[in-house]
Amino acid sequence: MEQRGQNAPAASGARKRHGPGPREARGARPGPRVPKTLVLVVAAVLLLVSAESALITQQDLAPQQRAAPQQKRSSPSEGLCPPGHHISEDGRDCISCKYGQDYSTHWNDLLFCLRCTRCDSGEVELSPCTTTRNTVCQCEEGTFREEDSPEMCRKCRTGCPRGMVKVGDCTPWSDIECVHKESGTKHSGEVPAVEETVTSSPGTPASPCSLSGIIIGVTVAAVVLIVAVFVCKSLLWKKVLPYLKGICSGGGGDPERVDRSSQRPGAEDNVLNEIVSILQPTQVPEQEMEVQEPAEPTGVNMLSPGESEHLLEPAEAERSQRRRLLVPANEGDPTETLRQCFDDFADLVPFDSWEPLMRKLGLMDNEIKVAKAEAAGHRDTLYTMLIKWVNKTGRDASVHTLLDALETLGERLAKQKIEDHLLSSGKFMYLEGNADSAMS
C-alpha cells in the first residue's frame, strides 16, 4: 500500500513533470503565426513599393527616352552641326538641343540652341516646340496679326463702312476684306496680308490701285473743266455787263459812264435787279441791233429818241422805277439819313409784313425776338428791328435794299408810300434830274 501510495505521488509527480510539455507545445503554436503575419505585411509593403517604383519608372521613362538624344553627341561636318544640334565650345562635338526648351532649324555653328517661343496671352499654340522647330502660335478667333506689327494680335472689324460690302472673313493673318459696291476698289486701312498677295492671280483685269487712279484722274479733270468754264463765263460776263447796262440805261454802252454811276450811293443795291431785268426774255438787245444795222453806213451808233422809246417801251415801263436812285438831299451819310426816317415806317408798312420784311433784310429769328423784347411799345417794334438791321449790316444798309425787299414781298403800295415820304420830307431826292419827273 505504501508503494502504491508512493507510486501515486510519483505518478502524479510524473504527470506534473510531463504536464508542461503539452502546454508548451500548445503555447508554441502562436509563435509561428507572428512570423507569418509579419511576412504578409512585409510582402504587402514590398508590393506597394514595387508598384510605386514601377509607376515612377514609367513616368520618367519618356523624358529619359527623349532626353537620350539630347545628350547624343556627333562630330560636326565641315564645322557645322545638323538641325536640332549646336556645336560644343571646343568645336569637336555636336550637342543635341533640349526638347521643349531650345531648337535649331538649319545647319549651324551656334554654341547654343535658340530658346523656344512661348505663346502670349491672346494666342493659341498650334504645335509645340521641338529640337528642330520653334513653337507655332496663332491669334485667337476674332483677332489677327498684321505683317508690320507681329508682336500683338488686333481685333477684327465687325463690319464694313457704308457703301462697301464684305468679301473676305477675318483670319488669324488678316482683317475682314471690304470692297466698294460700284468700282470694286479694295478698301482697307491695313497693309494686305501675305496670303492675299500670294493668292492674287496674274490674270486679274485691273488692280485696285489702277482703278482708283483712273477714277481720281477723271474726277480731277471734270472739276478742272467745270472751274475753267465758270471762270471764262465770269470774265466774259464782267466785260459784257457794263455795255448791256449802258444800252438799257440809254448810255450807248459807255463803260466809263456806267462805272461812274455804279460808284454813286445806292447804285450797288440795284445791280442784281438790273441783271435780272437784262436776262428777262424781252429780246430788247436783238431789236436794238436790228435797228442799228441800217444806221451803220451813216456812222451813227445811237438810235433817235423816238425810235428808242418806241422799241424799249415795254421794258422801260417795267424798269423805270428801278433806275431812279435816291440819294440824301444834303449830301449827308445815306445810312444815317435813312435811320432818321425809321420812326415813320411803322405807319407805312402793314403790321403783318414787319417780320417777313426783316427776314428779307437778313435778320435771324432770334434777332427779331430780341428786338421785339427790347421795343418800348408795339409801335416801336419795327423801329427797333430796323435799327438792329443797320447795326448788323453797317454801310450795306441802304434805302434801295429796303425798297427792294418790300417789292419782293409784294408790298408795292408800302414801297411807294415810303419812297414818297422820303422825297416829301426833303431828306432824299432822285439822282440825275429824276426828282422832277417823280414829283410831277
Swiss-Prot record:
Keywords: Apoptosis, Disulfide bond, Glycoprotein, Membrane, Receptor, Repeat, Signal, Transmembrane, Transmembrane helix. Induction: By ER stress. Regulated by p53/TP53. It holds the Pfam family Death. One of its GO terms (cellular component) is plasma membrane. The keyword Manganese does not apply. SMART domains: DEATH, TNFR. It is found in: Membrane. SUPFAM superfamilies: DEATH domain, TNF receptor-like. GO terms for molecular function: signaling receptor activity; TRAIL binding; TRAIL receptor activity. GO terms for biological process: activation of NF-kappaB-inducing kinase activity; apoptotic process; cell surface receptor signaling pathway; cellular response to mechanical stimulus; defense response to tumor cell; extrinsic apoptotic signaling pathway via death domain receptors; intrinsic apoptotic signaling pathway in response to endoplasmic reticulum stress; positive regulation of apoptotic process. The chain crosses the membrane at residues 211-231. TNFR-Cys repeats lie at residues 57-94, 97-137, 138-178. Disulfide bonds join 81-94, 97-113, 116-129, 119-137, 139-153, 156-170, 160-178. TAPE repeats lie at residues 192-206. Residues 1-32, 60-84 are annotated as: Disordered. Residues 56-210 are extracellular. Residues 339-422 form the Death domain. Residues 1-55 form the signal peptide. The keyword DNA repair does not apply. Residues 232-440 are cytoplasmic. Receptor for the cytotoxic ligand TNFSF10/TRAIL. The adapter molecule FADD recruits caspase-8 to the activated receptor. The resulting death-inducing signaling complex (DISC) performs caspase-8 proteolytic activation which initiates the subsequent cascade of caspases (aspartate-specific cysteine proteases) mediating apoptosis. Promotes the activation of NF-kappa-B. Essential for ER stress-induced apoptosis. It is linked to Squamous cell carcinoma of the head and neck: A non-melanoma skin cancer affecting the head and neck. The hallmark of cutaneous SCC is malignant transformation of normal epidermal keratinocytes. Monomer. Can interact with TRADD and RIPK1. Interacts with HCMV protein UL141; this interaction prevents TNFRSF10B cell surface expression. Two TNFRSF10B monomers interact with a UL141 homodimer. Three TNFRSF10B molecules interact with TNFSF10 homotrimer. In the absence of stimulation, interacts with BIRC2, DDX3X and GSK3B. The interaction with BIRC2 and DDX3X is further enhanced upon receptor stimulation and accompanied by DDX3X and BIRC2 cleavage. This is Tumor necrosis factor receptor superfamily member 10B. It comes from Homo sapiens.
